Amino acid sequence: MAAAAGGAASRRGAGRPCPFSIEHILSSLPERSLPARAACPPQPAGRQSPAKPEEPGAPEAAPCACCCCCGPRAAPCGPPEAAAGLGARLAWPLRLGPAVPLSLGAPAGGSGALPGAVGPGSQRRTRRHRTIFSEEQLQALEALFVQNQYPDVSTRERLAGRIRLREERVEVWFKNRRAKWRHQKRASASARLLPGVKKSPKGSC
């Protein structure tokens, strides 16, 4: 009876494969079809979800050496050798983005001249008309200066009418004459002091 049971078990085993065999385990796994794989768009580099583990054996993308904006997981912009050579030749990093050209033209709605530019005519200082006094006018002015170095307006007007000059010219002449008189006074005072300073060391010896 034991032999009959063993024979029946062997017949059942020959008809049905063992559930722990390699063929049975591999056949029970669901296979992903190629259209299903193609329907899933590949995620761009650098934005992979942290939950999805990376496939073992997949080479990690090398960082781009030709710009400073690429992340560590970004795809390389070119061959590693060419990118490394370009980065070694340039002393500064390349920046992405369009360069803004400098505007050298004239501003819109205005002339081509700069706002702070001033024409040559406006830089010229207005020169005063220098009055040439006659001998008679100089004598009258000097005579009044000896009497009064600071004449008032009425005195200047009377003198200007007598010597045929404007009162403004007479006032300017008195200002210049007082400045000249002060300069002569300081020069004469310093001339008197200098000989005494030079003679003092000789007297002490």
UniProtKB/Swiss-Prot annotation:
Its main location: nucleus. SMART domains: HOX. Detected in adult testis and pituitary, and in 9-10 week fetal tissue (thorax). Probably expressed in other tissues at low levels. GO terms for cellular component: chromatin; nucleus. PROSITE patterns: HOMEOBOX_1 (PS00027), HOMEOBOX_2 (PS50071). GO terms for molecular function: DNA binding; DNA-binding transcription factor activity; DNA-binding transcription factor activity, RNA polymerase II-specific; RNA polymerase II cis-regulatory region sequence-specific DNA binding; sequence-specific DNA binding; sequence-specific double-stranded DNA binding. The keyword Chloroplast does not apply. It is found in: Nucleus. Residues 126-185 bind DNA. Gene3D superfamilies: Homeodomain-like. Residues 33-58, 185-205 are annotated as: Disordered. One of its GO terms (biological process) is regulation of transcription by RNA polymerase II. It comes from the Eukaryota. The keyword Protease does not apply. InterPro entries: Goosecoid-like_HB, HD, Homeobox_CS, Homeodomain-like_sf. Keywords: DNA-binding, Homeobox, Nucleus. Belongs to the paired homeobox family. Bicoid subfamily. May have a role in development. May regulate its own transcription. May bind the bicoid consensus sequence TAATCC. This is Homeobox protein goosecoid-2. It comes from Homo sapiens (Human). The gene is GSC2.
